[in-house]
């Protein structure tokens, strides 16, 4: 027997028992007569000690380095009261070693387990990084999350059904990862960005409650919470309304937070996309932050200051104010830093006004734009924003999108900088009623979610007549400013689906070429259906309290979509490329 107990499972009830442990040497202290070691496995750490009286095993112990893989046999002993370590779960006991087997000693480590290592070091030697207790704990939590989800889905009548990994390239927003076919020369599979169409086809096949914990792939620019391959908790249902789907999924997340964190999330509030953008400058608002944007275009449309009056009188303009309580204490340097910050989002500047004394008229206001605004205007602004003495007002004035993006980002930054955001709180919500389409810089329409999302209460003819103002029957679950899941009611009428494709500029020939199988399937008694997908990586990131999604994935990629450990991607064998009919062209480096 290689193991009778996990290290972290030992406690006072095991005193007097002989145990067999297998794990790694975590730490060594040589005190001359005794050698103390901490032995670690995935469940925790326990202290063992070697007595010099047993010369043979004492000699072996003297040769062991940190991270050597060993088997320990010994007797569990209660520590003296003065020696109890309350910082360790196993701190009331230790193990007197009677025998030791060295499975493998360890070379000098390329990582220092007691210091912060660089991200590159951690990813290159990921198998060592994952031995660290804090990393092991995150992956254990991830496993428990998936276990909870599977139980919940099984209890609610969902079937776990797998969908293909090698599929057809369809336009879903990001670039596809392509896989060349050897048998069908010149043709390519795509790795799925999501199982979207297959799960809809399963609804058409009569499997009215489907789920899958599935890998998805997107060839897109990465950031801290994105990976080229990621895992979804994918869900689809037939004969359920959007409200019923949201209730089912809310109950699952509510139960998950209770199970993992003992936190009651309460009832999730529901907010429209329009309200979220107006009040918070984001479609995934962080409600832990009490700051809100207040629109003031009607107050500033007649002032003699073009920076304010032009966007205030423009159909695509916006003028808004962010009131920061006690913000009048901000220094000019801090304000300049915020001005630079909003510039990242396209803002040309950041006007501000300090309300030093709300009862002193213009004399109580300090602002570089005060000369353009009279006392009546400031009085209206103070009343609209509920400003009081000691507050500061930040102004955003430009095109609607620029103001919304820049002021929404400023709201988050100020909330964190000034400790206004309650980082200990959990604030979930549903965001609903998204626009069906969004315009790009050239005025072309694209689907805000995906082209299979149903509009809300519109016929195909009504949608075609006014697509810009169409509202999608879509919903996102947001927790603490992160979109953790998103879904919608799907189109189940072939005419509506063709109408949406047409609005997106997909002609009939391309519709048949790319989506002919779907359009055919829609003709044969397709049920109303709706679904949702959660990002498992992001859920785990939130529950474990990490801000880097790579910390909750066993073998993640870098932000350059590379694996430093295996050195993937790598060059392909020339013979394999020849069989595939592929020639690799070298790109000229830009000078």
UniProtKB/Swiss-Prot annotation:
One of its GO terms (biological process) is aspartyl-tRNA aminoacylation. Its EC number is 6.1.1.12. One of its GO terms (molecular function) is aspartate-tRNA ligase activity. ATP binds at residues 218-220, 227, 483, 535-538. Keywords: Aminoacyl-tRNA synthetase, ATP-binding, Cytoplasm, Ligase, Nucleotide-binding, Protein biosynthesis. Residues 196-199 are annotated as: Aspartate. Pfam families: GAD, tRNA-synt_2, tRNA_anti-codon. It catalyses: tRNA(Asp) + L-aspartate + ATP = L-aspartyl-tRNA(Asp) + AMP + diphosphate. The keyword Cytoplasm applies. L-aspartate binds at residues 172, 218, 449, 490. Catalyzes the attachment of L-aspartate to tRNA(Asp) in a two-step reaction: L-aspartate is first activated by ATP to form Asp-AMP and then transferred to the acceptor end of tRNA(Asp). Belongs to the class-II aminoacyl-tRNA synthetase family. Type 1 subfamily. PANTHER family: ASPARTATE--TRNA LIGASE, MITOCHONDRIAL, ASPARTYL/LYSYL-TRNA SYNTHETASE. HAMAP family: Asp_tRNA_synth_type1. This is Aspartate--tRNA ligase. The gene is aspS.
């Amino acid at each position: 027997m290689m193991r009778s107990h996990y290290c972290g499972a030992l406690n006072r009830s095991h005193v007097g028992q002989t145990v067999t442990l297998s794990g790694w040497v975590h730490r060594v202290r040589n005190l001359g007569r005794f050698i103390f070691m901490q032995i670690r496995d995935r469940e925790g750490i326990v202290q063992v000690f070697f007595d010099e009286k047993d010369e043979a095993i004492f000699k072996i112990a003297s040769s062991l380095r940190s991270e050597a893989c060993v088997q320990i046999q010994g007797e569990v002993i209660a520590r003296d009261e003065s020696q109890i370590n309350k910082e360790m779960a196993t701190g009331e006991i230790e193990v007197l070693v009677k025998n030791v087997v060295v499975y493998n000693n360890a070379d000098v480590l390329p990582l220092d387990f007691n210091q912060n290592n660089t991200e590159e070091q951690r990813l290159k030697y990921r198998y060592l990084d994952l031995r660290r207790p804090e990393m092991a704990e995150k992956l254990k939590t991830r496993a428990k999350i998936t276990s909870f989800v599977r139980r919940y889905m099984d209890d609610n009548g969902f079937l776990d059904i797998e969908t293909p990994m090698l599929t057809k390239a369809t336009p879903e927003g990001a670039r596809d990862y392509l896989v060349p076919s050897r048998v069908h020369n010149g043709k390519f599979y795509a790795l799925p960005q999501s199982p979207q169409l297959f799960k809809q086809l399963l609804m058409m096949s009569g499997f009215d409650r489907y789920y899958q914990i599935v890998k998805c792939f997107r060839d897109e620019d990465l950031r801290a919470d994105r990976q080229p391959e990621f895992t979804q908790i994918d869900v689809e249902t037939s004969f359920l309304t959007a409200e019923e789907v949201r209730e089912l999924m809310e109950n699952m997340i509510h139960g998950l937070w209770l199970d993992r964190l003992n936190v009651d999330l309460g009832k999730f509030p529901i907010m429209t996309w329009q309200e979220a953008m107006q009040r918070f400058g984001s479609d995934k608002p962080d409600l832990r932050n009490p700051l809100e944007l207040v629109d003031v275009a009607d107050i500033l449309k007649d002032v003699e200051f073009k920076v304010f009056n032009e966007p205030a009188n423009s159909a695509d303009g916006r003028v808004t104010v962010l009131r920061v309580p006690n913000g009048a204490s901000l220094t000019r340097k801090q304000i300049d830093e915020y001005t630079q910050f909003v510039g990242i989002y396209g803002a040309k500047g950041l006007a501000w006004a300090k309300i030093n004394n709300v009862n002193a008229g213009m004399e109580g206001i300090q602002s570089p734009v005060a000369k353009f605004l009279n006392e009546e205007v400031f009085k209206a602004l103070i009343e609209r924003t509920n400003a009081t003495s000691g507050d500061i007002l930040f102004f955003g004035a430009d095109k609607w999108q620029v103001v919304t993006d820049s002021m929404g980002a400023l709201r988050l930054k100020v909330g964190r900088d000034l400790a206004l955001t309650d980082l200990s709180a959990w604030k979930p919500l549903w965001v609903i009623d998204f626009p069906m389409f969004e315009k790009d810089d050239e005025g072309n329409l694209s689907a805000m979610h995906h082209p299979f999302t149903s509009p809300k209460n519109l016929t195909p003819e009504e949608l075609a007549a006014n697509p810009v103002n169409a509202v999608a029957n879509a919903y996102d679950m947001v927790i603490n400013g992160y979109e953790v899941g998103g879904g919608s009611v799907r189109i189940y009428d072939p005419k509506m689906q063709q109408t949406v494709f047409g609005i997106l500029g997909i002609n009939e020939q391309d519709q048949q070429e790319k989506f002919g199988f779907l359009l055919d399937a829609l003709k044969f008694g397709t049920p109303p259906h709706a679904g949702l997908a959660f990002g498992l990586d992001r859920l785990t990131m939130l529950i474990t309290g990490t801000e880097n999604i790579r910390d909750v994935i066993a073998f993640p990629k870098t932000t350059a979509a590379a694996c430093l450990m295996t050195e993937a991607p790598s060059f392909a064998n020339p013979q394999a490329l020849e069989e595939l009919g592929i020639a690799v062209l070298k790109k000229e480096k830009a000078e």
